[in-house]
Design a protein with these regions (language model features):
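Flexible loop residues that form catalytic
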Residues: 4, 15, 20, 50, ...
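Secreted/periplasmic carbohydrate-active enzymes, especially glycoside hydrolases
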Residues: 26-407, 411, 646, 652-855
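Substrate-binding/catalytic cleft of secreted carbohydrate-active enzymes
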Residues: 407-573, 602-605, 609-613, 623, ...
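Non-catalytic positions within long, well-ordered alpha-helices that form the structural scaffold/packing
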Residues: 398-401, 425, 617-618
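A generic secondary-structure signal for well-formed alpha-helical elements
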Residues: 19-23, 49, 120, 176-180, ...
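Aromatic, loop-rich ligand-recognition surfaces of beta-strand-rich domains
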Residues: 1-27
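Short, solvent-exposed loop/turn segments at secondary-structure junctions
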Residues: 4-6, 52, 135-136, 179, ...
Length: 855
């Protein structure tokens, strides 16, 4: 081929691959039947593009049909994931591999097929085939019969297959219907991310962001497929579903709680069924007789008027992170007919009362009588190709709790995995739950409002049992169409009455609209937008570590900043405006000459910027959700840890800034502030601040006594900067209670604002350290490092990094008690770390210690 004269890339229109091939994909064995349930994930699922199939669904779903040239399918998973998992396409997350994935091939209907057997004795009165999520629509067939259709990415499918399942081999076939309005690929480059969203919004509920946004590339196929669980359930004549337990406390007293429990029951028989519905929350039990006409479905409610035992004494309340423990009770509903279990549902209950007001046109949230301050971030997806499972959600949400976050936002509602809600319940992270409407500028109103409303009704019932649900929101940065808005208000009122609904994420009683680019740290304290309201989106680029850059970029694309960087969201223009990030690094620390130097200097900016992002909200403490706290693919912007679960410096800055009781410097006023978000009352605290020259000599210091009440900010010391300070100097502050440090902070400041290049004059420091590594009884690993600076020079941006003792490769994820910290001469610090054995690759971990001026 001849290189194009204009220097552009080649366009490959056709390729033929010959040879014996390499690895052959093998299906994963499905788990055995358990408690009336057979999981059909894994197993014998196969997949084929619909254009390659001439048979009907009735034919495909028979044992005699012989699939030819079908591939092994990943279920649950998207169509694209199946092709990636068999090696048919390159990993679209790496470098610019996304350009090698065909848009036209994956814009198609696809067929899934699975053969399974039902164990003898499994079948009771009724047998159901269940789908927890497909995209976009699906026709479902079993043993030669069409069962029905599922429409919308968040609608469950449940089909009565009692009379269709046979002994021996059974076959299910699913025709996945592609989106009607796929839109165009976003062309990201070093300058621009292209425009956000597009016509795919017409098909909502779907995975709208897969059309491409400034934080995610265009996903080929738009995540069509069987993306959530498929399973068989066997029950008696009556089923139970979608439980809800609400709590009312005699506030401000929290020593008792009045519970109301409800569940939906349905009779699948052709005759009236009489039975007993039994319920249990913790040690409290209750029951009532229920009569259901043929085919009848209804909600059965238990309240304290008829069941006085539902007044719980001394409940262990569910609290968000920083307010208390997220206590959960085991709960159950069981329907019995003639003392035989027809169906049962186990779930978890958090005893908590959410209340809300919109006084003065400002939304305020309260939990168990205390004002709730939402601090956290927006999530777009768990993973861009929907590859997260329970393990990944648990890690990510645990990271959020470790950062002292209290809330996450399910932006535009595109995460539908039960495992997210379960993890938030366990870790005490409240959820701001959006519905599937992006900014009106980023896509049209849904063309199929009835489908949208049906999905919304089903989805609210599905998630309503979770204590972590804190708020529902109709639309991102806009208002839903009137038909949908009215329907959403009705649905919440009928099905989840104790949770508040707002129409818009960024207007009316809340605030939003950024900014999204990097600003000098001080400027966040002077932003007026949304200062008096809960602000739903504000962020800045957050550059990954050099180790993760090596995992993300090709050797030729890692430096200088070019189109591969743009493909991974680091663009000069657009909302992230990474030009300002580059300028702040260059002015503050000098122009980086390599990707490694850039990544290391970027951690300074990551830390200072994100600390200011949250510390600047101290005036009114109305809450902030950063844009974004979680990245769903290898991105160079808007995250706290990266796609590989590597925390950046921003993670630890946020962890500090979001402490329930916190001491901080307000650079706009030079006040030292003690901020109490959720720590209760603390009397007689001692605040101490020192201004130090670059050689660590004390230029000025002062102490003050502070009484701090919850939900307050107290100014306690006015900083002074004496003459003859070194050009770059430090501010160190501590907050102590009974001699114990409860919060500390360390800043660097310059007489020439934002220019810290004199730091490069600091001598290299040899730190003293001692580390112990232990394997715990539960199979996890723990390490403790004690680091001491015995020199006369400050040691800055000290980073601990756990790697394998044999292969020297990072172990991820790892929880660090602190990182990217500084030690003055004579200071010593203990850092605790933990990780899972399954992530070690057979290595015992060791801890590497580096830093800005550390040898």
């Amino acid at each position: 081929m001849q290189e194009p004269a204009n220097g552009s890339r080649y366009i490959l229109s056709e390729v033929e691959v010959m040879g014996k091939g390499g690895l052959v994909a093998q299906p994963v064995a499905p788990p055995p039947a358990s408690k009336g349930k057979i999981i059909l994930s894994g197993g014998n699922w196969e997949l084929q593009r619909a254009s390659e199939v001439t048979a009907s669904g009735e034919e495909i779903s028979t044992p005699g049909y012989k699939p030819e040239n079908w591939i092994v399918a990943t279920v649950p998973g998207t169509v694209l994931s199946s092709y990636k998992n068999i090696g048919a396409i390159a990993d679209p997350n790496y470098a610019d591999n996304q350009l090698q994935v065909s848009e036209s091939f994956f814009w198609s209907n696809f067929w899934y097929r699975d053969e399974f057997e039902v164990p003898e004795g499994f079948k009771q009165d009724r047998l159901f085939l269940n789908f927890d999520g497909i995209n976009w629509k699906a026709n479902v067939f079993l043993n030669g019969k069409k069962l029905g259709r599922i429409e919308g990415a968040f609608m469950r499918g449940k089909f009565d297959v009692t009379d269709l399942v046979v002994p021996g081999k059974n076959v299910v076939a699913v025709e996945i219907i592609r989106n009607n309005h796929i839109g165009a690929i976003k062309e990201k480059n070093k300058q621009s991310t292209d425009f956000n969203g597009g016509i795919l919004g017409a098909d909502n509920p779907t995975f709208h962001a897969t059309i491409g946004w400034d934080w995610i590339p265009t996903v080929r196929g738009r995540n069509i497929g069987i993306w959530n669980d498929v399973f068989l359930t066997s029950t008696g004549k009556v089923t139970v579903a979608d439980p809800l337990v609400t709590s009312v406390l005699p506030l401000p007293d929290t020593t008792s709680a009045t519970l109301t429990a409800e569940v939906i029951v349905k009779n699948h028989d052709a005759n009236t069924v009489n039975g007993t519905l039994e319920g249990k929350v913790g040690d409290i039990t209750f029951q009532q007789l229920v009569s259901l006409a043929a085919g009848e479905e209804k909600t059965v409610v238990f309240d304290v008027k008829d069941f006085p035992q539902l007044k719980m004494e001394n409940p262990h309340l569910w609290w968000p992170k920083g307010y208390g423990a997220p206590n959960l009770y085991d709960a159950n509903f069981t329907f019995k007919v003639d003392d035989k279990v027809s169906d049962a549902k186990d779930f978890k209950v958090g005893i908590r009362q959410m209340t809300f007001n919109e006084d003065n046109h400002i939304l305020s949230l309260f939990i168990n009588g205390r004002r709730f301050i939402g601090r956290g971030g927006n999530w777009g997806f768990g993973e861009s190709n929907l590859n997260y499972r329970g393990r990944e959600y648990d890690i990510a949400v645990a990271y959020h709790a470790d950062m002292n976050f209290t809330m996450m936002r399910n932006w535009v509602g595109m995460i539908g995995d039960e495992e997210l809600y379960e993890a938030c319940d366990r870790h005490g992270i409240m959820i701001w739950q959006d519905f599937w409407l992006a900014n009106p500028a980023d896509g049209p109103d849904p063309y199929y409002p009835e489908m949208f409303i049906a999905n919304a009704e089903d989805y609210v019932k599905r998630i309503r049992s979770h204590a972590s649900i804190g708020l529902y929101c109709g639309r991102n940065e806009g208002f839903p169409p009137e038909q949908i808005d009215k329907a959403l208000r009705r649905i919440i009122k009928e099905d989840h009455l104790d949770i508040h609904y707002i129409s818009s994420s960024a207007d009316d009683v809340v605030s939003g609209h950024g900014p999204y680019r990097m600003l000098p740290a001080k400027e966040y304290f002077t932003l007026k937008t949304g200062n008096d309201k809960f602000h739903s989106e504000r962020g800045m680029p957050n550059v990954m570590t050099y180790e993760s850059m090596l995992r993300t970029f090709s050797p030729e694309g890692i430096w200088p900043q070019d189109n591969e960087w743009g493909m991974h969201d680091y663009t000069r223009e657009g909302a992230q405006g990474c030009t300002s990030f580059n300028e702040i690094i260059a002015k503050g620390y000098g122009e980086p000459q390599s990707a490694k130097e850039f990544a290391e200097l970027a951690q300074w900016v990551n830390y200072d910027g994100h600390r200011s992002l949250f510390e600047s909200r101290s005036q009114n403490r109305k809450g902030l959700l950063m844009w974004m706290s979680h990245s769903c693919w290898p991105s160079m912007v808007w995250q706290t840890y990266d796609y590989y679960f590597e925390p950046t410096a921003a993670y630890f800055a946020i962890k500090k800034a979001s402490e329930p009781l916190h001491i901080q410097w307000n650079p706009a006023t030079d006040e030292v502030e003690v901020v109490n978000y959720s720590a209760g009352t603390h009397k007689g605290l001692t605040a101490k601040v020192q201004v130090l020259n670059m050689d660590a000599s004390v230029a000025w210091e002062k102490e003050a006594t502070v009484d701090s009440n919850e939900d307050t900010t107290d100014k306690c010391i006015k900083l002074e900067f004496p003459e003859n300070l070194s050009k770059v100097h430090f501010i160190k502050m501590t907050l102590t209670e009974d001699g114990k440090v409860v919060s500390d902070n360390f800043y660097h400041r310059s007489l020439e604002e934002n220019n810290y290049q004199d730091l490069c004059q600091l001598a290299k420091v040899a730190l003293q350290s001692a580390t112990t590594v232990d394997k715990n009884a539960d199979g996890t690993w723990s390490a403790v490092s004690v680091i001491e600076n015995k020199t006369s020079t400050p040691a800055l941006m000290i980073r601990l990094n756990v790697v394998g003792g044999k292969d020297d490769q990072q172990i991820l994820p790892v929880f660090y008690s602190d990182n990217y910290f500084s030690l003055l001469p004579g200071e010593k610090k203990e850092v605790r770390m933990s990780w899972r054995d399954e992530d070690t690759r057979g290595n015992e971990g060791k801890v590497l210690i580096t830093g800005y001026n550390v040898e």
